[in-house]
């Protein structure tokens, strides 16, 4: 059995590296290219880059930035943000990006996902599901365009439909836990895991390596992703790019 991948997630806004709390309160923390270089040195398993400004503002992907990131990156790279069609996805993969990540597309134009899976291979297509608990119903609901638009769709339903349309991987992203570093919602994630028939990666909530270990041991998933955990250090959240060394990473699996 393959060991789960430990995946840093970097958020990009207008070309700069930022961090958010519950998809808001953007804080500029540096240059994404510099962060990639550091994760190269630390031999990260994989890297995810999400352009939140492209997602929120409906802009096309920043191809120049993506190409520079791909050229710099020495590990498998996934990219999401602003991808609306097969041509854009194909161009991004041509830079050396391993997987493209789409979110809003799964609701607004899911047939494009089927085309991507057919022509690019479903292993290259990840559907990200951004969800949070609504104040009125206290039920989980999917939000799109970087959390700015309600859909009325449950994450469970979207997960099933995304797989039907050809997604080769699901990225579950908790808006409520984004940047708060208080752990994952294990009970909710277990429900997702029970109905997910493709590889599943989880993002949102990690505040310690123990949180990663709990997720791996409880869910048996292929990928554990985190943002704040790998860019902050200490209770005052000083910016310091970090990643577990080989010994600490091995301890997560046993």
Swiss-Prot record:
Its main location: cytoplasm. It comes from Leptospira interrogans. Pathway: Amino-acid biosynthesis; L-histidine biosynthesis; L-histidine from 5-phospho-alpha-D-ribose 1-diphosphate: step 5/9. Keywords: Amino-acid biosynthesis, Cytoplasm, Histidine biosynthesis, Lyase. Heterodimer of HisH and HisF. Gene3D superfamilies: Aldolase class I (3.20.20.70). GO terms for cellular component: cytoplasm. It comes from the Bacteria. Its EC number is 4.3.2.10. The keyword Lyase applies. It is found in: Cytoplasm. This is Putative imidazole glycerol phosphate synthase subunit HisF. It catalyses: 5-[(5-phospho-1-deoxy-D-ribulos-1-ylimino)methylamino]-1-(5-phospho-beta-D-ribosyl)imidazole-4-carboxamide + L-glutamine = D-erythro-1-(imidazol-4-yl)glycerol 3-phosphate + 5-amino-1-(5-phospho-beta-D-ribosyl)imidazole-4-carboxamide + L-glutamate + H(+). One of its GO terms (biological process) is L-histidine biosynthetic process. IGPS catalyzes the conversion of PRFAR and glutamine to IGP, AICAR and glutamate. The HisF subunit catalyzes the cyclization activity that produces IGP and AICAR from PRFAR using the ammonia provided by the HisH subunit. InterPro entries: Aldolase_TIM, His_biosynth, HisF, IGPS_HisA/HisF, RibuloseP-bd_barrel. Belongs to the HisA/HisF family. The keyword Nucleotide-binding does not apply.
